[in-house]
Amino acid sequence: MKDIIGISFDTNDLDDDNAFLMMVLKEIDADLEWKVDCFTDYEDYLNSEIEGYLSIKELEKVLNESKKAIFIRIMGKNKAGKPQSIETKNDFFASDYEVCVLCCDSAYYEIYSKQEETVLKIKSMVAGRCSHVEMITKQTVCRTEFMV
């Protein structure tokens, strides 16, 4: 694993009802299934962990219904296909998951990946569109807890 483990950025107050989040997820991998924990302002998903894995289309439906992700943690499907308990950065990097997306208020993002190429791809996508874009390295980790 390389030194770059993630990226953080702000979406400059885009009021897009999760459209930018969907663009980010599709950029990571449009065919990946996602494990979702979320706090949203939509009652059906308030303080919930959605069972199983969602396809990008199913996730888009959830995000369209929720309108605004107050806090959402989305993890790409792990190799074993079984949900694993992820509470810390170390749990994530010891797991089979490849990517973890943390989003607050549909505006602030932290994306962690075991593949540096994924982080660099997201950096190219957000450059010039977002503010406070910062690469996260093993030495400069912003967060140790990955809990929702």
Language model segments and positions:
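Structural alpha-beta junctions
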Residues: 1-2, 27-33, 127-136
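N-terminal interaction modules that seed assembly of large macromolecular complexes
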Residues: 3-59
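Generic structural motif
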Residues: 10-14, 39, 77-80, 104-106, ...
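Short, surface-exposed beta-strand/loop "edge" segments at domain boundaries and coil↔beta transitions
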Residues: 13-19, 31-33, 82-83, 110, ...
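Short, surface-exposed beta-edge/turn micro-motifs
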Residues: 31, 96-99, 106-109
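Surface-exposed, low-hydrophobicity interaction/linker segments
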Residues: 40-101
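Acidic, proline/glycine-rich low-complexity IDRs
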Residues: 103-148
